[in-house]
């Protein structure tokens, strides 16, 4: 960092300020996490210099013998973690992993049945502003108005009516266990392929705390950050039968040279996921989410589906007459980072929203447990009760900073 501050003080100062933000605030964005020093070391290594188009043993460039080692380790460890026959670790993101699956199995104009974004889905699951919504005919399923949980009977009815070429399961803001076996049964009934995007829950799946889609779905995609606690990137898991098509869709289909420094960092993170400590960490993530959810519920906050089974919760602020936008801003002033989020059957725009999404992976990585979640919930409640009161929000922020700095960014 000293060298960077000398060579490029503007970028260096921005990074120093970001370190201060991360250490002095409470990170509750459900899709964010903190990686280990080992993962950061791999990602910042000389592997960033190397072009390696192709796959291990079949490169279009020379000098790839050592990056091949890194990629093979990432592949082997991913397959071991999830019990998969095949893994492609080259996708630069979860979005590109999803794109490769679509391109390998579908034709433009085919019908996809996927979860509505406002009910907890993802942009790449058919949103009209995304490539997936432009290339394919998308039919959406959602959650029950009564329970806030996926309405599997409705999914089955929609599948029978529309006969989709592919059903997509997985979400970015859904707090309950997803029944992948039920999705596969529906897919089989109508002759559809099933893709599961487990980006948010991959770490829980790795630790056996959520049913695995691998072996149930035809294709499983994920990011490698979030609960999996690796570098930002994507991955595809499937069987040997699909390998050739998937490989060719990643390269040369939608990507050129893979990011070998990121792939090495993925290998390191996957190695960490095979350690017993990783399972203990994931259990704590779930326990922390349950405690945070229960404390907020006891204070009169309404959670979509009534609670959480995983690492996140979706707080519906309608009964508090607070918008997600205002809540996010107030929390930020109080030293707590979260994101506004649409809720099922949303009445406000995506730029305003009626909810906020909260997650515990990052705080758990810092070493926080249930007792700390009660404190965090107290500050959230205080901040949301003082929207517009900048004096009180500043006081909360000072308390939050003093508390947060007691914890390192990464703790086993």
From Swiss-Prot:
The keyword Amino-acid biosynthesis applies. Its cofactor is pyridoxal 5'-phosphate. It is found in: Cytoplasm. Keywords: Amino-acid biosynthesis, Cytoplasm, One-carbon metabolism, Pyridoxal phosphate, Transferase. Gene3D superfamilies: Aspartate Aminotransferase, domain 1 (3.90.1150.10), Type I PLP-dependent aspartate aminotransferase-like (Major domain) (3.40.640.10). Its main location: cytoplasm. It comes from the Bacteria. Its EC number is 2.1.2.1. One of its GO terms (biological process) is tetrahydrofolate interconversion. One of its GO terms (molecular function) is glycine hydroxymethyltransferase activity. It holds the Pfam family SHMT. It catalyses: (6R)-5,10-methylene-5,6,7,8-tetrahydrofolate + glycine + H2O = (6S)-5,6,7,8-tetrahydrofolate + L-serine. It is an enzyme of class 2 (transferase). SUPFAM superfamilies: PLP-dependent transferases. GO terms for cellular component: cytosol. Homodimer. Belongs to the SHMT family. Catalyzes the reversible interconversion of serine and glycine with tetrahydrofolate (THF) serving as the one-carbon carrier. This reaction serves as the major source of one-carbon groups required for the biosynthesis of purines, thymidylate, methionine, and other important biomolecules. Also exhibits THF-independent aldolase activity toward beta-hydroxyamino acids, producing glycine and aldehydes, via a retro-aldol mechanism. This is Serine hydroxymethyltransferase. It comes from Oleidesulfovibrio alaskensis (strain ATCC BAA-1058 / DSM 17464 / G20) (Desulfovibrio alaskensis). The gene is glyA.
